[in-house]
């Protein structure tokens, strides 16, 4: 802490939510595996690098990191690891092409040969470092690296249900199964069972806290409006003892706001402007209304200065918020800023560097930084509260996942889940023998696996936001078809055909290998 920055009351927690849908084996570009590899290279590699560096400096309790089972499965999958290595090698080749470019028909300022050569040289160094780092550290997947950070208490890990379903609309049996299997998946990968979860889409329905308590979950995230904006303390929900933490919108929107958030600053790398020869992003934002054809070349020194300015601004915002909220409630307050992990690096190129600097700067400015578990253990918990049905989507309700635009998804999901549960129940009953354990049924396992992929919250979100909506509809109906196809064969007594179908679908959808239909609540 510097001499001119006295300690402020309370605790600040940064929460990052890491999630992508299952993309392996389901398309390459523009939506599919390319989405995974871009996020991995731009966000996950830099974030782990930042956290490992800060841990080596002796820092701990830095942030709370949500890792959904479906994204962790891809970070550990041999197919994805091989694909990521190839993607990084291709990035290196594209950077080399830019660094040696002599002529170009593109006359935009950021894509002239001179500008691209300078940009390409920097990009080449970055790609070479990323490829070397990946080959050295990631050869066994992401879980060993994350486990090191959890064991060192660098981060707190949040878990979540398998495949990221919108829980309020899910059949209670499948909802319980998805959550318990998701926590078991984390335990298997990290030798650690998370005390808290990031509820998919921060979605909540009254009574879900009891399900959480029964599964051993002690705390979860909601959006600020779910607590009517009073997020200064965690709040037990009803008499469950499970604590809901609300995202502080005033602090979070300082970073993550389409109109005034840091990533839109003129100095930062522009996400949308590409060099069409190499696919690289050589321009800076330049201005909010500046077309891509007029954007200026990226200037790392200018961006670096902007990062420093935004670190200083954020630190002051957090200090002021902690002081104000502590005065308002008459006791030390807790401020939670929560973001998608992919914001840092993928959407906002400079985001990982901003994170590294802000996590150093906050303690120096007299701000205590800790995790959600720290907040519970240290008493940053207020009186019990009843929560409304809510989410962090548009309108803070369920409309993104249950509105008219996606009503067909709601019906599809209900039908597929009913089919899956009835088929699995029948199959397990037929296999059961008095006095002997029921054998594992990989056909029933695959039915549930495909069902969970069908009900992923990503598909209706993408349709509601008109973001790769055709791909989202294709994926939902593909997994629904897989569920029905296997279930129909099994229900008709064609066990061998059902096994062949299950094995075939498993070649594309082999995630959650420990998923066991025998643990489905009866």
Please provide the spans of the model-predicted regions:
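Acidic (Asp/Glu)-rich catalytic clusters
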Residues: 5-8, 52-59, 141-158, 187-190, ...
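His/Asp/Glu-enriched short active-site or ligand-binding loop at hydrolase and phosphoryl-transfer sites
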Residues: 218-229, 368-371
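CE4/NodB-like, metal-dependent polysaccharide N-deacetylase domain
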Residues: 175-199, 317-338
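Active-site-proximal, well-structured secondary-structure segments within enzyme catalytic domains
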Residues: 101-143, 148-168
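Conserved short loop/turn motifs at secondary-structure junctions
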Residues: 194-204, 340-344, 468
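Hydrophobic, small-residue-rich alpha-helical packing segments that form membrane-like cores
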Residues: 203, 208-217
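Active-site and substrate-binding clefts of carbohydrate-active enzymes
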Residues: 4-63, 67-125, 231-522
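Glycine-rich phosphate-binding "P-loop"
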Residues: 159-181, 185
